[in-house]
């Protein structure tokens, strides 16, 4: 595996993980039943992934290392399926089924919606700039 790719993924992942950690510290105490730090990391990650998908599609000039840094590295470090899973299982073990369902829907539907929104925002900006 090329060293530049390894460094790109590792560097991006570190920055994304630090941001996720900071969001958790700031936001999880606000509403402990539905940890907002994890949710915001996943929603922001979805939005940024939409931006990245559309920009990468439009600009093939972005180097593979930059793509790895942004998507696999940074967004992979920012978003968190394992923490999401642990939080959902904790709610279910506490028999908080309503909140577990709300959390699942918020993360899954919210992240998909934010990814679509990211794509649409970039498309709108390109259309506006071309007009």
Question: Each predicted region: which residue ranges?
Answer:
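Membrane-interface helix-loop junctions in multi-pass transporters/channels
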Residues: 1-131
